[in-house]
Amino acid sequence: MVSLAKRVDRDVMPVSLASGRTLPNVTPIMQAIGTSGFIVAENGGMVWDSIQGHGIRSLSDGSRARKAAEWLATKIEGLDPRGIESNRWRETEWCLSNTDSFEQMKSLIADSEWSDLEVVSTGFAVHIANPGLDKSLGLSIAMDQRGIDPKRVIACGDAPNDIPMFDLVGFSVAVSDLYPEVVASADAITEERGKSGSIELLKALLGQ
């Protein structure tokens, strides 16, 4: 997949990464791929375009999200407020590993002093963030820095946190059918799923 991404970046269009992972997690992946795009991390909360010489931009303060997680731990038995290990590097949101309790978390937050916060599950973790903080925000800033029209961008994803990104770009591709709402928001879905679906998309962009 890395070699395909490099070829797309060289011959078709710049390849960027937009992820729910932290910047320290995404950066080495981007470096390993070696493409000319930018990074959007923490579901839109962190933007870094080192290729174009732009500094790291942190778009939110995750302290309220962390306090909300600590409060949730007093309401849900067995919930660890420390969340996933990468929270140690998280600046703009807070992530909890108890995905089975997602609906309960969402309901509790909705009736609390943190009702303005967004609660989104990616299947891997439950992300708690300030309102309006999503991939479309970070991507809009990153694209604006480069003078890119979002409608000339293709994006792929597989989880609910990708929906704002799908709504922003000109063409969106779902590489999983696990979430019906993700499939419904996408312009197309790959025949293969997951990593194989991403490879299918890259090959299609290369005309293979």
Predicted regions, residues:
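Short, structured coil segments at secondary-structure junctions
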Residues: 33-35, 43, 113-115, 168-169, ...
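Phosphate- and divalent-cation-binding pockets in alpha/beta enzyme and binding domains
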Residues: 25-28, 104, 138, 164-165, ...
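Short active-site oxyanion
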Residues: 11-16, 36-37, 151-152, 168-171, ...
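Active-site phosphate-binding/coordination module
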Residues: 1-87
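Short amphipathic alpha-helical segments
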Residues: 27-31, 52-53, 107, 167-168, ...
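Asp-based, Mg2+/Mn2+-dependent phosphohydrolase catalytic module
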Residues: 168, 172-208
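Conserved acidic, metal-coordinating active-site core of Asp-based
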Residues: 68-168, 177
